[in-house]
């Protein structure tokens, strides 16, 4: 392998390609003369669009083929949305870099209404996320929530075709695809706690590839890593897959981190919440401690029921 060449495995969706192009541009900016190649690939998660993710294996479906490419030395790195990255990595691979986070909030998207509170009784909202479903149903049990799969463009087209009165998407994806004008309003973390890692981009590579790790190192954003570590640690302790009604959101003020978390029944009938504050350098411990608090309040009963249905 040439010392100044990196191959990036990426999904083919516009958002995945944006993320890969972002990393490519950053590497080229930091390392003049480097040759960065993109290897677009289809994953099972991109192909199976007619079934809710929870029923076909969760969001790990979006990364497996990329990981195989790295293990087979067809690619050097893979670029992921952190909210799609499973807790465990295949032997020989690891998460080397977490880039600076984009806006982590959910976005309310509608051609007719400005916010969830403006929606009329019985309006139809599109989202496949159990996390979003439980929080919307808790505040607006009258709303009809329908599954929504596909890439961002497909989801917006379904809204424009009148299949939904509104849809909920990650704000970061719309911002990155220069579709901010489609956002009717940003949903505050208080109203809809984001998914762990939402808005952050991670780079996975072979853990023994020191050449690639050295090239990637300048892309690391330490504050984002602390935040995402706390959120993922909470999710891991809860034994949460990617398609679960779990919200986690960490914020940092100076050296102090505040982590909020929730587990909700997808029907909105019960939401268990907690908050913890401590040193940002103890991000993982804070995540585990908050998970323990949620479990002590009954989170396991909710999660067991969700897994039983999946």
Curated annotation (Swiss-Prot):
Cofactor-binding details, from the entry: Binds 1 dipyrromethane group covalently.
Transferase as UniProt keyword: yes
Pfam families attached to this UniProt entry: Porphobil_deam (PF01379), Porphobil_deamC (PF03900)
EC category name: transferase
Modification S-(dipyrrolylmethanemethyl)cysteine occurs at: 242
This protein's UniProt keywords: Porphyrin biosynthesis, Transferase
Identification of the protein by name: Porphobilinogen deaminase
Miscellaneous comment text of the record: The porphobilinogen subunits are added to the dipyrromethane group.
Catalytic activity: 4 porphobilinogen + H2O = hydroxymethylbilane + 4 NH4(+)
Xref: HAMAP family: Porphobil_deam (MF_00260)
UniProt record, GO biological process: protoporphyrinogen IX biosynthetic process
Pathway note: Porphyrin-containing compound metabolism; protoporphyrin-IX biosynthesis; coproporphyrinogen-III from 5-aminolevulinate: step 2/4
Described purpose of this protein according to its UniProt entry: Tetrapolymerization of the monopyrrole PBG into the hydroxymethylbilane pre-uroporphyrinogen in several discrete steps.
Subunit structure: Monomer.
Cofactor requirements of the protein: dipyrromethane
Family that this chain belongs to: Belongs to the HMBS family.
Single GO cellular component term: cytoplasm
């Amino acid at each position: 392998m040439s010392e100044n060449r990196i191959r990036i495995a990426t999904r083919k969706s516009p958002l995945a390609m944006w993320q890969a192009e972002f990393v490519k541009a950053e590497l080229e900016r930091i390392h003049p003369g480097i040759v960065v190649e993109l290897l677009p690939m289809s994953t099972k998660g991109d192909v199976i669009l007619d079934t809710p993710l929870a029923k076909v294996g969760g969001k790990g479906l979006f990364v497996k083929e990329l990981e195989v490419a790295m293990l087979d030395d067809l690619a050097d790195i893979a670029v992921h949305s952190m909210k799609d990255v499973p807790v465990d990595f295949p032997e020989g691979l690891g998460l080397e870099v977490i880039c600076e986070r984009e806006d982590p909030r959910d976005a309310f998207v509608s051609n007719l209404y400005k916010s969830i509170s403006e929606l009329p009784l019985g309006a139809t909202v599109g989202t496949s996320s159990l996390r979003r479903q439980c929080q919307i149903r808790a505040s607006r049990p009258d709303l009809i929530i329908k599954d929504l799969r596909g890439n961002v463009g497909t989801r917006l087209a379904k809204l424009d075709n009148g299949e939904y009165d509104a849809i909920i998407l990650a704000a970061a994806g719309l911002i990155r695809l220069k579709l901010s004008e489609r956002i009717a309003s940003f949903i505050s973390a208080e109203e809809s706690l984001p998914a762990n890692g939402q808005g952050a981009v991670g780079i996975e590579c072979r853990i023994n590839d020191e050449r690639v790790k050295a090239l990637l190192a300048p892309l690391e954003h330490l504050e984002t890593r602390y935040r995402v570590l706390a959120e993922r640690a909470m999710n891991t302790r809860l034994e949460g897959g990617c398609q679960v009604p779990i919200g986690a959101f960490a914020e940092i003020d100076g050296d102090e981190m505040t982590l909020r978390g929730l587990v909700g029944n997808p029907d909105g009938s019960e939401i268990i919440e907690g908050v913890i504050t401590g040193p940002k350098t103890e991000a993982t411990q804070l995540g585990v401690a908050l998970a323990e608090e949620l479990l002590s309040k009954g989170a396991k009963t909710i999660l067991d029921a969700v897994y039983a249905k999946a």
